[in-house]
């Protein structure tokens, strides 16, 4: 499984690029199979690519393209979210993230830039993305120009929000700290968060990293280079507007790497500053920026051009004060070619941050489970790769047709629809369903030439039960029996039905024709409960009204196998109204016996029972009621003692938590047949078809 980290910040210009460079350099010492991903990037200005993506791709020579390296533009995310289509934002991000993550050992995600006015939206979006991707978070704060309290307040608020969303945070770094405040801020971090398993660190404000190079000023101000083009890498630590007499101006010239800003017609200042630059009694300057589009006199230019060590001379068309104001709006960006700044950034990160401690936290993080978005994405990808053939008997139902449209248009499965073909075509046309019926096999069981062959097969299977061939012909006009026979004979890989028919109408033909797998005494069911931050398995909530201890044990083991097959680590809780040995009575004794049977059959499986629901999901309750249990507090598979309890519980959880419930998914059959709820939505049908495709052996 790919290791990951999500770098998130609390405000703009926190110096994320330094931390990105430091982390990737750290990880590269462990593995070369790394990737870098930005879920959201700023809209391109004049066609320019995102600077941080180019910086990373070129500096670390990663084997990924620019377009692979980001999800979507900020304006796209805002527009879709405003239209209530946040799921489209997340789906696009997830697809591109998985494309990279599936090829590497580690992926670093860098959050958005907070350059607009939607900072609250950005924070929530970054939190949602990190949670969806199951990425631990490294939180980066910005102390530039802030007091200690102002630097720590956004960190407190962010951590509180992450805690509420059950996000895992592996570190807090405060960047751009004034050196004189570094010790106190570090002490405050330790005092506030030292009891949490996190890396805590500060990175001091660095004058070189915060300073523009002259070439950035030339670009930002659209300035001309009059001389010194080979010195545009000079760093500008300060800038000074000079309009007074040169004798007075020199009094203010006491910082090195200063950019002098003066009108272009002030030849006295230009020459005086040039001489000061050469003098051992004054600091060297970064350059001279002339304003108001005034070119120096030709004689002055001739003099400057003859000086061997003259600083660069630049010219801009704006007046002096406007030029100075525009200069304040420019911010340095780490260029992919600025090797000195890149090396300095990495060295500063290594010096200030305990990288090995961060790596250890990343290694020891135990995921609570796969997130719903990731779970469903993985299922769809696997089903698409498998290209199974699924039969949908209720082909005239509008929800089935809408689901079929999505499945076909996205190339997830191959489909056969059963029903009156003219009725199917009419329903598609009247309801403007985007389904190309030429890509779907349509069969009317009542007129199909295959019905006679299917009837003969059914007759052979059921004649010992008194079924005649004439009866078989009549039975095979039923869509459920016809679809089930297609699966039995290998003419379809699986079947999904039940949107307008009962569970028995779906299950009975499967039991009669497909039958249970060897070693299975019954067919049972599970629901995949896609909660906000994890996916759980509930069984049996649909088929067996009151299983005995043997049957309950079988349901538990089958459900655990189903969970494992779908990427969920099985930790099985057999539920009852009491935990451990505290309760008595026939109901709890049945669960106790079922647990013993299941443990005997699979001793290596993490399994606990009887256990109450709260002890199964809540670590605090688990510590009190069942200390030391491998399941209590972290169960992923929940086995209910009877249908009444299971069905009501799954519906209550679904309603109260807005969870997506996928199922019921049938277990124990020789070939996959699955039932739908009659109240199912189009999305439920799609999910069940995907699951069915993946149950095919």
Swiss-Prot record:
Subcellular location: Cytoplasm
Record InterPro entries: DRTGG, P-Actrans_bac, P-loop_NTPase, P_AcTrfase, P_AcTrfase_dom1, P_AcTrfase_dom2, Phos_Acetyltrans/Butyryltrans, PTA_PTB
UniProt protein name: Phosphate acetyltransferase
Source superkingdom: Bacteria
Catalytic activity field: acetyl-CoA + phosphate = acetyl phosphate + CoA
Similarity comment: In the N-terminal section; belongs to the CobB/CobQ family. In the C-terminal section; belongs to the phosphate acetyltransferase and butyryltransferase family.
The UniProt record lists the keyword Protein biosynthesis: no
Protein source organism: Synechocystis sp. (strain ATCC 27184 / PCC 6803 / Kazusa)
EC number of this enzyme: 2.3.1.8
Segments of this protein annotated with the region Phosphate acetyltransferase: 374-697
A biological-process GO annotation: acetyl-CoA biosynthetic process
Domain description: The N-terminal region seems to be important for proper quaternary structure. The C-terminal region contains the substrate-binding site.
Principal place of residence: cytoplasm
Keyword Transferase: yes
GO cellular component: cytoplasm
NCBIfam families with a match to the protein in the record: PRK05632.1 (NF004167), PRK09653.1 (NF007233), pta (TIGR00651)
SUPFAM superfamilies tied to this protein: HprK N-terminal domain-like (SSF75138), Isocitrate/Isopropylmalate dehydrogenase-like (SSF53659), P-loop containing nucleoside triphosphate hydrolases (SSF52540)
Function, as annotated: Involved in acetate metabolism.
UniProt-recorded Gene Ontology molecular function terms: phosphate acetyltransferase activity
Gene3D superfamilies (alphabetical): 3.40.50.10950, HprK N-terminal domain-like, Isocitrate/Isopropylmalate dehydrogenase-like, P-loop containing nucleotide triphosphate hydrolases
Pathways per UniProt: Metabolic intermediate biosynthesis; acetyl-CoA biosynthesis; acetyl-CoA from acetate: step 2/2
UniProt keyword annotations, A-Z: Acyltransferase, Cytoplasm, Transferase
């Amino acid at each position: 499984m790919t290791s990951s980290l999500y770098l998130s910040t609390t405000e703009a210009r926190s110096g994320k690029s330094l931390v990105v460079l430091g982390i990737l350099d750290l990880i590269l010492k462990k593995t070369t199979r790394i990737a870098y991903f930005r879920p959201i990037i700023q809209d391109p200005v004049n066609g320019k690519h995102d600077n941080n993506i180019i910086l990373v791709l070129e500096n670390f020579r990663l084997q990924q393209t620019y377009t692979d390296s980001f999800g979507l533009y900020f304006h796209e995310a805002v527009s879709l979210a405003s239209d209530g289509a946040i799921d489209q934002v997340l789906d696009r991000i997830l697809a591109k993230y998985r494309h990279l993550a599936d090829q590497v050992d580690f992926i670093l995600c860098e959050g958005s830039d907070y350059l607009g006015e939607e900072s609250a939206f950005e924070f929530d979006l970054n939190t949602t993305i990190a949670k969806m991707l199951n990425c631990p978070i490294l939180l980066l704060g910005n102390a530039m120009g802030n007091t200690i309290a102002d630097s720590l307040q956004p960190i407190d608020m962010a951590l509180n929000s992450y805690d509420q969303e059950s996000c895992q945070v592996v570190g807090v770094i405060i960047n751009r700290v004034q050196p004189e405040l570094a010790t106190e801020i570090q002490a405050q971090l330790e005092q506030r968060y030292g009891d949490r398993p996190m890396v805590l660190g500060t990175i001091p404000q660095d004058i070189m990293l915060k300073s523009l190079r002259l070439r950035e000023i030339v670009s930002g101000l659209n300035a001309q280079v009059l001389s010194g083009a080979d010195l545009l890498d000079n760093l500008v630590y300060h800038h000074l507007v000079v309009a007074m007499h040169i004798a007075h101006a020199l009094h203010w010239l006491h910082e090195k790497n200063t950019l002098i800003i003066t009108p272009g017609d002030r030849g006295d200042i230009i020459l005086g500053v040039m001489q000061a630059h050469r003098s051992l009694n004054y600091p060297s300057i970064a350059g001279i920026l002339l304003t108001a589009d005034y070119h120096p006199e030709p004689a002055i230019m001739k003099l400057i051009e003859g000086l061997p060590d003259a600083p660069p001379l630049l010219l801009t068309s704006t007046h002096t004060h406007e030029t100075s104001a525009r200069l304040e709006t420019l911010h340095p960006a780490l260029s992919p070619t600025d090797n000195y700044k890149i090396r300095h950034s990495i060295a500063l990160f290594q010096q200030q941050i305990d990288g090995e401690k961060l790596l250890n936290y990343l290694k020891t993080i135990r995921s609570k489970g796969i997130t719903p978005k990731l779970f469903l994405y993985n299922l769809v990808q696997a089903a698409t790769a498998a290209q199974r053939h699924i039969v949908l008997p209720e082909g005239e139902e509008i929800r089935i047709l809408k689901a079929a449209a999505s499945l076909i248009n996205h190339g997830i499965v191959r489909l056969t629809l059963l029903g009156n073909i003219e009725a199917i075509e009419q329903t598609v046309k009247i309801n403007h369903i985007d389904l190309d019926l030429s890509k779907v096999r349509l069969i009317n069981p009542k007129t199909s030439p295959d019905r006679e062959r299917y009837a003969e097969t059914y007759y052979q299977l059921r004649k010992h039960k008194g079924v005649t061939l004439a009866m078989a012909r009549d039975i095979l006009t039923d869509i459920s029996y016809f679809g089930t026979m297609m699966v039995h004979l290998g003419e379809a890989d699986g079947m999904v039905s039940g949107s307008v028919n009962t569970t028995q109408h779906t299950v009975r033909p499967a039991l009669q024709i497909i039958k249970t797998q060897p070693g299975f005494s019954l067919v049972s069911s599970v629901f995949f409960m896609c909660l906000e931050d994890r996916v759980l398995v509930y069984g049996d909530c649909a088929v067996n009204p009151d299983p005995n201890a043997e049957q309950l044990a079988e349901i538990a083991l089958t459900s655990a196998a189903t969970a494992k097959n779908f990427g969920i680590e099985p930790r099985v809780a057999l539920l009852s109204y009491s935990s451990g040995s505290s309760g008595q009575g026939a109901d709890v004794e049945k669960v106790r016996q079922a647990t013993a049977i299941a443990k005997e059959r699979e001793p290596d499986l993490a399994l606990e029972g009887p256990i109450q629901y709260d002890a199964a999901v809540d670590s605090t309750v688990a510590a009190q009621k069942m200390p030391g249990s491998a399941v209590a507090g972290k169960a992923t598979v929940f086995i209910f003692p009877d249908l009444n309890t299971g069905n009501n519980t799954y519906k209550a959880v679904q309603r109260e938590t807005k969870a997506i419930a996928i199922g019921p998914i049938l277990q124990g059959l020789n070939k996959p047949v699955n039932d739908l709820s009659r109240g199912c939505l189009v999305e439920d049908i799609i999910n069940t078809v995907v699951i069915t495709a993946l149950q095919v052996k």
